[in-house]
Amino acid sequence: MRIHRHFTAAVITLAIFGGIQCSYSAEDDLAPIKAEIAKRHDEAVKRLQDWIGQVSIAAENRGYPKGAEYMAKLARDAGFQQATVINTDGKPGVFAKLDAGAPKTIGLYFMYDVKQFDPAEWTSSPTEARIVDKQKPPLGKVIIGRGAVNQKGPEAAFLAALHAIRGAGKTLPVNLVMVAEGEEEIGSPHIPQLVRRPDVLDALKKCVGVFMPSATQDLDGIVTVNLGSKGVIELELISDGEKWGRGPAKDIHSSL
């Protein structure tokens, strides 16, 4: 993750939510927040490094329930008044709310788990989150670590924006409802149990949309904001001509 992009990503967060209501429409209103982002840069980088060091890998049953507890703490530290660990039949999730007294509410999707890794394939420990000067390609200072891009880096940048807004004495123009899961990397098998809880579902129904922080800034600094996304579905399709009554009753070559 490119270090100075923390500033840019946090400002992008402000721009997205500032567009809902004109609370931060003037540049003068954004100036103290931008200054706070710059002042808290090292703090934000350290927060991400610490988070990368807290590994949760669902496929290896590693880092639970500590990963969920850590996620809840990050939310509370960023200003969420409520952050609760929700147990499921699999790995726990986190449900958090930030009431800014605003007329509109935005949902947030977070994931705190990462893919498994082989340390031998890394130039430095994937849990160390080492800062290196990347020359090829010329990126400058970057963090090397599992989750730096997918997905803790973008999420940490979002949380950094919340810290900066509060530090500048400003109030968010929207309320936030966060749902964070710990099984995204294995296909989110238990997220229905999380989002269908009556209290979580009630909060989500009040949201005008759902935002997922992601690494969408290219090397030229251009940012792409996705306005929609598709989910994942796994299924097994069985075509049985015999039962249908209009096809072969035994196995045939696939070309037929």
Regions found by a protein language model. Name each.
Residues 1-10:
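Bacterial N-terminal signal peptides that target proteins for export
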Residues 9-19:
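Bacterial N-terminal signal peptides
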Residues 20-25:
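Sec/Tat signal peptide C-region and signal peptidase I cleavage site
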Residues 26-148, 167-174:
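Acidic/His- and Gly-rich active-site-bordering loop/insert found
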Residues 142, 147-228:
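Acidic/histidine-rich catalytic neighborhood of metal-dependent amide-processing enzymes
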Residues 142-144, 243-249:
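Short small-residue beta-strand/loop micro-motif enriched in glycine and branched aliphatics
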Residues 202-203, 218, 227-234, 246-256:
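Acidic-enriched catalytic cores of C-N bond-cleaving enzymes acting on peptides and small amides
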